[in-house]
Amino acid sequence: MAADGERSPLLSEAGDGGAGGNGLAGPGGSATGPGGGLTPSAPPYGAGKHAPPQAFPPFPEGHPAVLPGEDPPPYSPLTSPDSGSAPMITCRVCQSPINVEGKMHQHVVKCGVCNEATPIKNAPPGKKYVRCPCNCLLICKVTSQRIACPRPYCKRIINLGPVHPGPLSPEPQPMGVRVICGHCKNTFLWTEFTDRTLARCPHCRKVSSIGRRYPRKRCICCFLLGLLLAVTATGLAFGTWKPAQQYGGIYAAWAFVILLAVLCLGRALYWGCMKVSHPVQNFS
């Protein structure tokens, strides 16, 4: 009975809505009202369910991104924020960009396209940069007037013109003489003022003599020495002809003297046939 009392308020509330609160539940799930009619005791379908959640309120209408009749904004490609942070320079030869990140401590960097050097810093004190027509970057003294390209296929002499150093410059202007090579007829600078007037041309890499005095003197000395040895060998041969037949070691002495005479005469021929390079101006 206690259980029926606990359930009664629920039934009475459902019945009060349709029969005034005095009806009883029948076996078919219906309650009998005062007038004898059957009234449904169960609530209508959907009455016991929770109400569906309401939708979110609509967003307030704002201005459109592009107004009618207005051009869209210009296109800008998305780039990485680090793409423009790396320091770049332009190659002085092929105009290609060169990334110098991590190379700022160097004076020059090498281009990855043309493999030529491009300076990124000023030259060291007392030096300057010079670019050869073959695109080779050279570094030389600020007082240099002529330099030679070190590349084997170039070997070009670059005339830098007169340089007037300041009064505080500790490096004197190089002294020398312009010489026309006796082999290739090119002009180069000769700066070795010694008794040996032999010079190697930077163009053809051949040795020649500056003037005729040095090779002529060497030729005369070698010729006279060779002539003296030849006369000595002849006299030795005639003087020791009979003893040489008994002692075979005398033939070795003949051969040694004759060999010295041939070497001296050959050296005299070398100096006599040496090419001569002529200077085009006096020593400065």
UniProtKB/Swiss-Prot annotation:
Q: Where is the composition biased (Gly residues)?
A: 15-38
Supply one GO BP term. Answer: lysosome localization
Do you know which InterPro entries this protein is assigned to?
PtdIns-P2-Ptase
Find motif (CX5R motif) and give its ranges. Answer: 140-146
Q: Name one GO cellular component term.
A: lysosomal membrane
How does this protein lie in the membrane? Multi-pass membrane protein
Q: Which residues cross the membrane?
A: 219-239, 246-266
This protein's assembly is summarised as: Interacts (via transmembrane domain) with ATP6V0D1. Interacts with LAMTOR1, RRAGA and RRAGC.
Report the function annotation for this chain: Catalyzes the hydrolysis of phosphatidylinositol-4,5-bisphosphate (PtdIns-4,5-P2) to phosphatidylinositol-4-phosphate (PtdIns-4-P). Does not hydrolyze phosphatidylinositol 3,4,5-trisphosphate, phosphatidylinositol 3,4-bisphosphate, inositol 3,5-bisphosphate, inositol 3,4-bisphosphate, phosphatidylinositol 5-monophosphate, phosphatidylinositol 4-monophosphate and phosphatidylinositol 3-monophosphate. Regulates lysosomal positioning by recruiting JIP4 to lysosomal membranes, thus inducing retrograde transport of lysosomes along microtubules.
Q: What's this protein's name?
A: Type 1 phosphatidylinositol 4,5-bisphosphate 4-phosphatase
What are the leading ranks of the lineage?
A: Eukaryota, Metazoa, Chordata, Craniata, Vertebrata
Gene from which the chain derives: Pip4p1
